[in-house]
């Protein structure tokens, strides 16, 4: 994929000519796919796939198996499950599940994922993340007793790593920055002088890591403190030796930096820093004058490692807003049901999705794990996060028309995407087939709101963690709603699922519309925002 050249050809061509050709490739790819996140026109023959595992992403592709493997056993909960589907189970397109609840659908197989590396944890001090101010020459640019009742069904999924104490994190930063390995506490980072003069200047630590708050194959997230202001921030560390990591990082980078205005329900992105050989450089998206940025894009396009080796590790660091309240799962399931809180969360989520769609962004992985909570203002505020699978639709075009990167009249509900990606319990029927639009976000939001109001959950069989998620019961198994609707589009959803749930008629009808099997029957984000303001949660 992309522009292929052998190392010998590259050396012969010379650095300047090579970068010039790479820029041409980048310009061509930018117009169609947004830096390695190619969205081809949907076709029944081949569907690219990115599969997800809670709480963070793992990307894999696999060829279509010859026969459908046996479904994982999922223990059903008596008394609170959805009634069995009325239609027989008919032929289902072939797919495969693994023990983490991931799905693979037909598509080309990319290079094998880089093995996840868990940093050693020793030491007795908080580790400084050494990011100096960039030179001018660099680019800038519980409540207890909350839930009682029957046991939730089990579903194999991954769960977040438990919070690690700050005393154990110093080696993690040392692995990131060799200079930090020898200088504890008041460490320095060598960088070149802005005026181009020789020698090194000391750099005050920009951020100090406090605790690890999340880990996945995509990266590690730390709680950190800004050295100058003392503000708490979240810092995501992504190792650049795996092309899949770089591709997901660039997708998130593009989505968050394309937002020209802030929204209180979207996690705020502060800056991106590329660290290599002990030197840090701020990155700006789309800067074709940055050789390092072009090499990142080349890594994503070619699917081969360009930056980052064992002897000289290379990392991307995303600095973002810190949310101290955990995710939506933790917040909702640790408190008693409250119609006022439910209504507030519904309004906040619809406002966030409308804002994203207005800015031509399809999230594609909405789920409670990716919705964070902050209570700094005294009331819970939701923050939609984790944009690694998101798609910026500016520059795409309807069939038969040329793309226009500057087109401000993009309608995300008319742009067809083809990568079957997301988390299975929240995937719309059309996503399973690999032919969908932004209406898939509306379906995922419907699943989240339904599960939040009724406290419908399943249990991770490995970690025993309870997760919000709506499902359909088929015999002794539980099936994601989108998958069941794909088998039987005429299946009637019983909302509310529990007889004792108090739910207004307005919410019932709104949820049915959001979960319609046909995406054309669902409201778009702007209509949903208007309707959501007019309904009440309790009957």
Swiss-Prot record:
Subcellular location: Nucleus; Nucleus, Nucleolus; Cytoplasm
Annotated ATP binding sites: 213-221, 236
Domain Protein kinase: 207-535
Principal place of residence: nucleus
Protein modification: Autophosphorylated.
Primary enzyme class: transferase
Keywords: ATP-binding, Cytoplasm, Kinase, Nucleotide-binding, Nucleus, Phosphoprotein, Serine/threonine-protein kinase, Transferase
UniProt entry tagged with the keyword Lipid metabolism: no
EC number, as in UniProt: 2.7.11.1
Basic residues bias spans: 148-160
Database matches in CDD domains: STKc_PDIK1L (cd13977)
Region (Disordered): 103-161
Pfam family, one: Pkinase
Active site positions: 365
PANTHER family listed in its UniProt record: EUKARYOTIC TRANSLATION INITIATION FACTOR 2-ALPHA KINASE EIF2-ALPHA KINASE -RELATED, SERINE_THREONINE-PROTEIN KINASE 35
Self-association state and partner proteins as the record states: Interacts with PDLIM1/CLP-36.
Entry similarity comment: Belongs to the protein kinase superfamily. Ser/Thr protein kinase family.
Protein name: Serine/threonine-protein kinase 35
Organism: Mus musculus (Mouse)
Name of the encoding gene: Stk35
